[in-house]
């Protein structure tokens, strides 16, 4: 049987990791990696809910923080399963483009602030998702520590 993952042909052991929550606390990141190594973690899923941190303002992309984390994980023998960050939209998007928010059966759009609150049929939403995913792949897709891509989180988890 041909190996699907040629970079690491062993059982992957890890889970979701959301370090953007404590990006300004390097000691927490160091301790996390220490604990991961102690637990024999060899991969983590990164970026699932990081859109607001990756694109804090429309068209303004910040990938350096994520690259540094992927670098540090890789230096410690931990691969990254890089997620498309579309599980949660940034606030600027829901505030500027009402049509990107999901609409309930009553015809009323959901309020901002929910995960998976996007409207699949919104051309704006599709364009913005395509852009963030393209930029993410352009900046980090060839990183040696990226072993797999995690495409969308909990597809259909928004009640659609």
Model-assigned labels for residue ranges:
Residues 106-160:
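Polysaccharide-binding and catalytic clefts of secreted carbohydrate-active enzymes
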Residues 2, 29-110, 134-137, 141:
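Aromatic-lined substrate-binding rim segments of carbohydrate-active enzymes
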């Amino acid at each position: 049987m041909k190996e699907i993952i040629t970079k690491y042909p062993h059982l992957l052991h890890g889970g979701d990791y959301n370090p953007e929550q404590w990006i300004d606390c390097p000691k927490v990141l160091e301790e996390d990696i220490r604990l991961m190594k102690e637990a024999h973690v060899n991969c983590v899923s990164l970026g699932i809910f990081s859109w607001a941190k990756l694109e804090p303002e429309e068209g303004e992309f910040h990938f350096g923080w994520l690259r540094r984390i992927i670098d540090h994980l890789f230096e410690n023998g931990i691969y990254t399963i890089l997620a498309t960050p579309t599980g949660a939209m940034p606030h600027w998007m829901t505030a500027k483009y009402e049509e990107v928010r999901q609409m309930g059966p009553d015809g009323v759009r959901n309020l901002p602030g929910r995960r998976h609150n996007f409207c699949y049929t919104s051309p704006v939403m599709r364009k913005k998702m395509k852009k963030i995913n393209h930029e993410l792949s352009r900046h980090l897709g060839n990183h040696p520590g990226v072993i797999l891509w995690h495409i969308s989180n909990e597809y259909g988890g928004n009640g659609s």
